[in-house]
Amino acid sequence: MTKYAEKKLLRSRLLEARRSLPFEEVFSLSKKAQRRLLGTRFFRDSGRLALYSSFANEVLTDEVFKHAVEAGKEVFYPRVSLEGIRFLRVKELDELTPGAYDLREPTEGFEAAGPESFDLIVIPGVAFDESGGRIGFGKGHYDMALKGATCPIVALAYEFQVLKTKIPIEPHDVYVSAIITEERTVVVTGALRGRKGEEHDA
C-alpha cells in the first residue's frame, strides 16, 4: 500500500471516530486539553500566537483565546484561500465569520502576520504519532503555510488520535513540536525533526 493510500485510510477511520463524539464529550475533553496547554511553557512564553477555529469536532480553542487576550497576547487565526493560509489578528471571537470550507475565519483587512513572527502556533489534525508526525485533512494548507515557522508548533488532539505506531509521512509534511491531549503532553525531542517523542506531565 502506498503512503498516500495509508494516510487516506487512517484519515477516514479517525475522522469517523471524531465525528461520532457527542458535543458534551467534545466540550469536556477540549476543556482538559486546553487547560493543559495553558499550563505549558509554550503558552506562558508566547506573546504572539496563532490559533485555529475548531471544525468537525476538533478540540475547541475558545478558552485558550480568552486567556491569551486577557494576558495581553496577540492572537491570529488562519484564513484559507486558493493561495493558501494567511494569518490575521483577531481581538474578539465574534470577528470570526463562516468562510472557506465553512470554517470560522477573520475577514480581510485585519492585521496580517507570517508564521516566522509567531512565538507559538497551535494547529489541529486528524492523526498524530509520538514522533510528531501529523495527518491533516489532506489539503496541505498547514504543510505549505508553516514551512517558514521557527517557533514551537503544538497540536491539540484527543488521546485516540495519537497513535503508538508511526504514521506514513511524506517529504512535504510538517512535524509538530508537541501534542497535547486531555490526558497528556507529548513533547517531541528534536522539535520538528520527527525524532522519538517523550511524554511529559503538564
Model-derived regions: residue spans:
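Surface-exposed, charge/polar-rich loops and edge strands
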Residues: T2-A5, L9, E16-S20, A71, ...
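N-terminal active-site beta-alpha-beta segment that forms phosphate/nucleotide-binding
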Residues: T2-E116
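Glycine-rich, N-terminal phosphate-binding loop of Rossmann-like dinucleotide-binding domains
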Residues: S53, G125, E183
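Short glycine-rich anion-binding loops that position phosphate/pyrophosphate groups of nucleotides
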Residues: F55-N57, V126-E130
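Charged helix-capping and loop-helix junction motifs
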Residues: K66, G136-H141
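A short beta-strand-loop-alpha-helix capping motif that often carries His-Thr
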Residues: G84, I121-G125, G138
